[in-house]
A protein has these predicted regions:
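Flavin (primarily FAD) binding-site architecture
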Residues: 114-129
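Pore- or pathway-lining transmembrane helices of multi-pass membrane proteins that form conduits
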Residues: 136-139
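A generic structural motif
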Residues: 32, 97-101
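General small-molecule cofactor/ligand-binding pocket signal
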Residues: 20, 77-79
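A conserved short coil-to-beta-strand element within the FAD-binding core of flavoproteins
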Residues: 80-95
Length: 139
């Protein structure tokens, strides 16, 4: 299930139409208690909104469409089977240690964003490093 907000981001990436065309649009929401329907509500797009509230789409389609789109973007470097195993805060950057089946390497970045899913290997590393706790994250 993907929300309207996800679809809006995908529109910015140029894959929103493809996702909606393949997915199942939710038009009605229902709340049940046992066999009894307690409430029903409209999930159709709101006036002035392009996208519905939700669509159902298998994750493998979403991933495939995003990978297809990334192949058209030369500024994106997609790396498979790479795992961040360590982070080191520097004055103006972060040094990452990355493990691959071919061996480890280091990468320097200005920013690090943990977008590696529910079983993130990156977020626990960030959480345990006080160096990554900035005033912005503490307030």
């Amino acid at each position: 299930c993907f929300s309207k907000r996800s679809l809006e981001y995908w529109d910015r990436l140029g894959v929103g139409d493809r996702m909606v065309d393949k997915g199942v649009v939710w038009s009605v929401g229902r709340i049940f208690h046992g066999e009894s329907q307690l409430y029903q509500f409209n999930l159709l797009p709101e006036d002035g909104h392009k996208r519905p509230a939700f669509i159902n789409l298998q994750q493998y389609y979403a991933e495939a469409y995003l990978v297809d789109r990334i192949s058209d973007l030369p500024e994106v470097d997609l790396r498979w089977r790479n795992k961040v195993t360590a982070l080191e805060q520097r004055n103006d950057s972060v040094a990452l240690t990355i493990e691959t089946p071919e061996g480890a390497y280091r990468l320097h970045a200005q920013y690090v964003v943990a977008c590696d899913g529910a079983r993130s290997s990156l977020r626990p590393i960030i959480r345990t490093s006080r160096a990554f706790m900035t005033q912005a994250t503490l307030t």
